Regions:
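A solvent-exposed interaction/effector surface
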Residues: 1-156
């Protein structure tokens, strides 16, 4: 099992694009390009690491109903529009693991994180957050993802 760290995630403002549907079908590259372009047009300084916020568990939610947001941190006073919205993500305590692997390995990583959360007297207290530390790469026909998976937690 990957090493789990309990961390305090700082509050941040993000610009994001909402999605409903299969997590594997999110046009990640297109969205990130649009978000950074949007920030540049508005002369807003973006953060370096894009992120995904995932509201629904694949084990309990049909693919067509899964809600998510792909976003980037933004610094400065900026308002969203019809397509790209902005919001504050509050400060929170998270259980975090580093992930490097094919997208097909995400379920096992989430299972391991969920087990750690339960075994250590915590419960999930919000949607999971994935912070992408590197652009995905194609290796041997598979897409390799680089992310920190964060589970917002609170003591039971």
């Amino acid at each position: 099992m990957p090493k789990v760290k309990v961390e305090t995630r700082k509050a941040m403002r993000i610009a994001y694009i909402e999605h409903t549907g299969d997590y594997g079908a999110i046009p990640f590259d297109r969205d990130i390009e649009r978000l950074y372009g949007w920030a540049k047009e508005r002369k807003v300084r973006p953060g370096f690491y894009p992120l995904g916020i995932y509201y629904d568990r694949p084990a309990t939610t049909p693919p067509e109903k899964r809600r998510s947001e792909i976003g980037i941190p933004v610094y400065g006073d900026v308002k969203g529009d019809r397509e790209i919205k902005t919001k504050e993500v509050p400060k929170m305590k998270v259980a975090a693991i580093s992930f490097k692997g094919p997208a097909s390995a995400y379920p096992a990583a989430y299972d391991a994180l969920s087990a750690w959360v339960a075994e250590n007297g915590y419960e999930w207290s919000g949607p999971s957050i994935e912070v992408y530390s590197k652009k995905p790469e194609k290796v041997g026909g598979q897409t390799i993802m680089y992310a920190k998976i964060e589970a917002p937690i609170r003591k039971k």
